[in-house]
């Protein structure tokens, strides 16, 4: 059995299918891990979600900020933003099945056999693996609890508070947890977030650094797969941290990682997020991914 992890899809179905065909993905035997941001901005959000739903028995997903935004706009359509490509999902006859499936996905996945964690954006540097899983479960519970669901989605938007505190409660607590797992790029060593900076690692403001680069990070004994940060172009200097968002929806590429061999494959994308030429490039373990 092979386990493949793929970076942000954002409604770009063609490159995903090219990658899976290239590695001869067999849903009866293999497993597909997805780092979140399954939908939005790309040309085929509805088709992508339907395709993933058809593979759900072979699939492990964690939620990204765009997936949570989808759930929020499904409740309140006025939250739709310019550039969102979610309306087709909201008007689809099978929307309840698709949205219900999204709602049941995790914020963090951990494979104990491989000692590999998967998240969308990152793990707060001050959290141990055990604490990270616990805090992810708090949000997962809110997503699946009818009494908490609406209040969580209504209150999840926002950049404050910028730092974790064990005494945080209610929606404020859930918002901070969500921001770490789905929006974080730069932070201080004790986890104070900068949610405005979105460019490459060299653009950090003084006192801040990429979440994965802090020497005091408490998950250094765990391999971590993440997406979200397209400006990294799939590059990360940390030996056990694997960045998979290579900017497919922006005309970059979509990246697939064999979780066991660490071999990468990349499919070139055009400016619309479609497979540019059907070309898939194999990148050896330890090699620098394509820009």
Curated annotation (Swiss-Prot):
Q: Which reaction does it catalyse?
A: P(1),P(4)-bis(5'-adenosyl) tetraphosphate + H2O = 2 ADP + 2 H(+)
What GO MF terms are annotated?
bis(5'-nucleosyl)-tetraphosphatase (symmetrical) activity
Cross-referenced Pfam families: Metallophos (PF00149)
Could you tell me the keywords of this UniProt record? Answer: Hydrolase
* The keyword Glycoprotein is annotated on this UniProt entry: no
Identify the EC number(s). Answer: 3.6.1.41
- Read off the SUPFAM superfamilies from this record: Metallo-dependent phosphatases
Question: Which NCBIfam families would you find in this protein's record?
Answer: apaH, PRK00166.1
Task: Give a short account of what the protein does.
Answer: Hydrolyzes diadenosine 5',5'''-P1,P4-tetraphosphate to yield ADP.
Which family does the similarity line name? Belongs to the Ap4A hydrolase family.
Please identify the protein, giving its name as recorded: Bis(5'-nucleosyl)-tetraphosphatase, symmetrical
User: Which organism's genome codes for this protein?
Assistant: Pseudomonas syringae pv. syringae (strain B728a)
Query: What lineage is on file?
Result: Bacteria, Pseudomonadati, Pseudomonadota, Gammaproteobacteria, Pseudomonadales
What is the primary gene name for this protein? apaH
């Amino acid at each position: 059995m092979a386990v493949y992890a793929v970076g942000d899809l954002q409604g770009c179905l063609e490159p995903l299918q090219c990658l899976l065909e290239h590695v001869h993905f067999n849903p009866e035997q293999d497993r597909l891990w997805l780092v979140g941001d399954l939908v939005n901005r790309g040309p085929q959000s509805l088709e992508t979600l339907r395709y993933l739903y058809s593979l759900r028995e072979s699939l492990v997903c964690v939620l990204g900020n765009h997936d949570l935004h989808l759930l929020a706009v499904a409740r309140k359509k006025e939250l739709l933003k310019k550039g969102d490509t979610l309306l087709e999902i909201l008007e689809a006859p099978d929307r309840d099945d698709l949205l219900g499936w999204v709602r049941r996905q995790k914020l963090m996945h951990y494979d104990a056999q491989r000692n590999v964690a998967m998240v969308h954006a990152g793990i707060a540097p001050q959290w141990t693996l055990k604490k990270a899983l616990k805090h992810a479960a708090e949000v997962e519970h809110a997503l699946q609890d009818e009494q908490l669901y609406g209040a969580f989605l209504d209150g999840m938007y926002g950049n404050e508070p910028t730092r974790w505190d064990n005494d945080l409660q209610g929606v404020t607590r859930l918002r901070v947890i969500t921001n770490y797992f789905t929006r974080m790029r730069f932070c201080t060593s004790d986890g104070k977030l900068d949610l405005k900076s979105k460019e490459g690692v060299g653009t950090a403001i003084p006192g801040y650094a990429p979440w994965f680069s802090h020497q005091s990070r408490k998950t250094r004994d765990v391999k971590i797969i993440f997406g979200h940060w397209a400006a990294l172009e799939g590059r990360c200097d940390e030996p056990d941290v694997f960045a998979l968002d290579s900017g497919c929806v922006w005309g970059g590429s979509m990246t697939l990682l064999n979780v066991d061999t660490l071999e990468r494959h990349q499919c070139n994308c055009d400016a619309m997020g479609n497979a540019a030429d059907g070309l898939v490039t194999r990148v050896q373990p330890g090699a620098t991914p394509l820009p």
